[in-house]
Amino acid sequence: MDGFAQDWPSLTHTTDNVLTMDQLGGVSGAVGDLPGDVGFEPQTRARSNTWPCPHPEPFVEPADELDSTKASNQQLAAGDSQQTIQSANAAKKNSARRNAWGNLSYADLITHAIGSATDKRLTLSQIYEWMVQNVPYFKDKGDSNSSAGWKNSIRHNLSLHNRFMRVQNEGTGKSSWWMLNPEAKPGKSVRRRAASMETSRYEKRRGRAKKRVEALRQAGVVGLNDATPSPSSSVSEGLDHFPESPLHSGGFQLSPDFRQRASSNASSCGRLSPIRALDLEPEWGFTVDYQNTTLTQAQSQVLDQLAGSIADELKLHPDMLQQQGFSAASGLPTQPPPPPYPAPQQQQQQQPQQQQAYTLNGGPPGGYASLQPQPQCLIHRSLNCSCLHNARDGLSPNSVTTTMSPAYPNSEPSSDSLNTYSNVVIDGSGDNGSLLVQQQRQQQQQQQQQQQLGSNLEGQCLEVLNNEAQPIDEFNLENFPVENLECNMEELLQQEMSYDGLLDINIPLAAVSTNAPLVNLINNSSTTISSSSNIGCSTTTSSSSLSASAQLNQLQAQLQQQHQQQQQQQQQQQQQQLQQQQQQLLLNNNNNNNNSLELATQTASANLNARVQYSQPSVVTSPPSWVH
């Protein structure tokens, strides 16, 4: 091969128990010259003939890495190869040869091959050729049959060791170059072992750590967690000064809030509460000693409530749920019939209980106001309507017995006596207590009035208009309480005119004639004002009820017409289907008749042909006259 500077140096051994190649050749020649009658005793040998050879008896394995692997990582010049091989062989004085060709490994041979090239690079085929030409062991193993094993080993070592570097060849269709990596570390690349091979070392290291921990415990090293121990803290049992932990370099101590992932409270979402912790500090500046703080019974109960889950904290008061008609699971109005309305005295007793259940330190309840249904005028569909205010103020202070109709389908009306508190005497001194009592009673009166209006209107009007399952004939406004309602005609007209003709107001002439003197009587006395307003409101409500009933009748008629049309269409479709079926039957019958006729004609013609052939006599032809 032209690319090498010189031939591979001869392998000489200086050991006593290993012969060189030349000596081995001389010995073989001498043995060949011996006469045949010289007898040698048969030598016993081991069963296995594989390499490496078994070690001799006094063999001691060196503790450190071989010098050959350390020296072979560098680029070797041609002149220094002899000294390197001698030093490598000198390191193995007490051991047998590692391989069949000597103590050099495949990596060492590849290193010598690449280093002996002029441009310090070889392809894979050139490395094979160098092995066959320069190593005596591979001279007779260059053919394809016997070279598969050692060529595979060479490829394996090229990819395994970090001392070899693969460079892409510039030419197309050519194999890559293999070069020596000058930046590679000495020795083999670190290979990761399985955990099962290092169990003894791991157990030793773990035992040492346990001994150190016990020594620290006995020495009395106390961490920060010993003062205020927590059940979920991962810094357990005085391990704050563990010397070999990467977290403790420099001797720092872990915080007591440091927690392990498995024992942290982030994994238990059910125990977390979005409510802020109870503030036990007073309003002044200095902090409170929590160890000496004595909690009151109310505060301890509050803390016990806050320690529960979110579902336990968001429970609503059962009395309020029954009163408002909400379900505790979903917060939506429930469909079963409501219970009877409680008396005002029961409501007075329930209201302070609800306030106590929703306040911690006497403050106003936060979420109770949002659950109260807002009053809405069912005629004008607005919250701020004068009809509601006039209806609230126009109720008589005496006890009124009315028929209550709950706003739920298929429920019976319940009659309760609503006692309004009209005998309230407020002192002129303006005492705060009397003002609070007055406000509470006014709120209770408003709630009772809202229940009156809402139950009557929702039970009779809204149930019919919004529920499609109920028939339209159940709409009835005869029991509508119009005696105590007052209405502003100007506001009503403006409200109706703002709908741009969507709603009609039909005021009869008699009602207009009665409204004219009533307007004059408004300026004279308050009694005439209330009566005229009552009459006006009654006329408007009657007119609106008439228009609503007319619209409902129209809707009912339209629905009936649509139903009749659908029935007619269904009947027509059924008739068409019947006609099509009859036509198909007729066609099938005609086809069958035609087929039967064809078959009959065919059989008849066949019979006639057979008869004709059978009845014809045999014709004997006579010879012509000229034949004698």
UniProtKB/Swiss-Prot annotation:
GO molecular function: DNA-binding transcription factor activity; DNA-binding transcription factor activity, RNA polymerase II-specific; RNA polymerase II cis-regulatory region sequence-specific DNA binding
Annotated function: Transcription factor involved in the regulation of the insulin signaling pathway. Consistently activates both the downstream target Thor\d4EBP and the feedback control target InR. Involved in negative regulation of the cell cycle, modulating cell growth and proliferation. In response to cellular stresses, such as nutrient deprivation or increased levels of reactive oxygen species, foxo is activated and inhibits growth through the action of target genes such as Thor.
Modified residues (Phosphothreonine): 50
Stretches the record annotates as Disordered: 188-210, 223-270, 327-373, 398-451
PTM annotation (Phosphoserine): residues: 81, 196, 264, 267-268, 273
Pfam families noted in UniProt: Forkhead
DNA-binding region, residues: 101-207
Subcellular location: Cytoplasm; Nucleus
Assembly notes: Interacts with melt.
Domain of life: Eukaryota
Lineage of source species: Eukaryota, Metazoa, Ecdysozoa, Arthropoda, Hexapoda
Bias (Low complexity): 344-359, 438-451
GO biological process terms, semicolon-separated: cell differentiation; glucose homeostasis; negative regulation of cell growth; negative regulation of cell population proliferation; negative regulation of insulin receptor signaling pathway; regulation of DNA-templated transcription; regulation of lipid metabolic process
Cellular component aspect of the GO annotation: cytoplasm; nucleus
Polar residues composition bias: residue spans: 227-236, 261-270, 411-423
Alphabetic keyword roster: Activator, Cell cycle, Cytoplasm, Developmental protein, Differentiation, DNA-binding, Growth regulation, Nucleus, Phosphoprotein, Transcription, Transcription regulation
Regions of compositional bias (Pro residues) in chain numbering: 334-343
Keyword Phosphoprotein annotated: yes
Keyword check for Nucleus: yes
Name of the protein in question: Forkhead box protein O
